[in-house]
Amino acid sequence: MAIAFQDVNTTSLGAITSDLNKAARPTVLVFDSGVGGLSIYQEIRQLLPDLHYIYVFDNEAFPYGEKSEEFIVERVVQIVGAIQQKHPLTIVVIACNTASTVSLPALRERFSFPVVGVVPAIKPAAKLTRNGVVGLLATRATVNRSYTKELIEKFATGCRIESIGSAELVELAEIKLHGGKVSPDILKKILKPWLGMKKPPDTVVLGCTHFPLLAEELVQILPDGTRLIDSGVAIARRTAWLVKHQNNLVCTSADSLAYCMKVNTDTDALIPVLQEYGFSKLEKLIT
């Protein structure tokens, strides 16, 4: 059985109690194409429980992995702009590896608030591996992007990187969050290239924010001692630092809420899940 492991510098992190008046809190927007960004939101909220959160998922264009870079950039900028018209934003977290690798420059040029992105945790994985073999589990788009290859060249030149690109894992994570069951046989089929290796990865980077939602299932299938690493804790720490060092915070007393881009039976089924995550309601975003 594998072991779940999230951050090379992880210690026992307690929640940071805000010095701000709890009736007036700065707003953090967490954005993803689907529900995978909830794994990032969960880490941020654990560290900063007193903030006002907005979660937006673009279920109309989900998944982003198969979309063009131009489409993603235009889409993300448009959605963030629509939220800005409704809420005073302190920080935006793009909790999607695919969107982060292509849209951050455009977002930072357009908006004045800080924008935090998510990238595969190649650097800590390269430091943690014991056998020199690191697995990258991500979407095909993330695996093939030049940005990911640059991370590998910069931080993991002494390692062998074994990559698996899978859109099916994204769908499985969505199914799980909607209350469905994940088939171990399907996971074994996806992970088959690693399971048959004489020297498989001992450290696996979860390079999509959906994949931590499947950590429980993945550790049952990967070899004993395999470490799973994602970027959640690092993103939470970065967000906490930015909140602390922001000037002229515009605060709100509103409840945390979620937005989607289209409403259907799937989003109806998500409402109780989102409420468990602390969101008072789910609305359709009009752009």
From Swiss-Prot:
The keyword Disulfide bond does not apply. It is an enzyme of class 5 (isomerase). Keywords: Cell shape, Cell wall biogenesis/degradation, Isomerase, Peptidoglycan synthesis. One of its GO terms (molecular function) is glutamate racemase activity. Pathway: Cell wall biogenesis; peptidoglycan biosynthesis. GO terms for biological process: cell wall organization; peptidoglycan biosynthetic process; regulation of cell shape. InterPro entries: Asp/Glu/hydantoin_racemase (IPR015942), Asp/Glu_race (IPR001920), Asp/Glu_racemase_AS_1 (IPR018187), Asp/Glu_racemase_AS_2 (IPR033134), Glu_race (IPR004391). The keyword tRNA processing does not apply. PROSITE patterns: ASP_GLU_RACEMASE_1 (PS00923), ASP_GLU_RACEMASE_2 (PS00924). Substrate binds at residues 32-33, 64-65, 97-98, 209-210. Pfam families: Asp_Glu_race (PF01177). It comes from the Bacteria. It catalyses: L-glutamate = D-glutamate. Its EC number is 5.1.1.3. The active site is at residues 96, 208. Provides the (R)-glutamate required for cell wall biosynthesis. Belongs to the aspartate/glutamate racemases family. HAMAP family: Glu_racemase. This is Glutamate racemase. It comes from Photorhabdus laumondii subsp. laumondii (strain DSM 15139 / CIP 105565 / TT01) (Photorhabdus luminescens subsp. laumondii).
